[in-house]
Amino acid sequence: MYIIICLDDNNGLAFNHRRQSQDRIVVEDISKTVGEKKLWITDYSRKLFQAVSNLEISENPKEEAKKGEYVFQELETLDTDDEQIEQFIIYRWNRVYPADVSVEIGVEWKLTETEEFPGFSHEKITKEIYCRESNGENSFGCFLSGGRVSNT
């Protein structure tokens, strides 16, 4: 599964059981990235993705998603050692927000692609693609191509 998260400059994810921020350009980019594949979300995230038709709503999207499917994670931290995770897609707000939930990306994950674009309510959004490394090699051969995440 591909995990999609939005983080601030301190890797903050959420504060007081709420998302730190939102940006409709990020939501549009997520929709383009996912394409026709399933996007698993919680009911909390539903209002962000009203225009997306291939949504799957679950209280535990990470438990339901299969290989090659996407999970948008908003309110809870992640176990980055989870072998089910094929790739991380991180949207950075390029700001610091209050946070009581954060994510630490382990050393086994390698930043493979970066893209910057203007958001609607954020001057700059940074999209980062992380792939798992195995013995110093990229085990999934993932890359960003034309706004889509692909595996070779």
Task: Show where each model-derived region lies.
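Enzymes that bind and transform nitrogen-containing heteroaromatic metabolites
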Residues: M1-T152
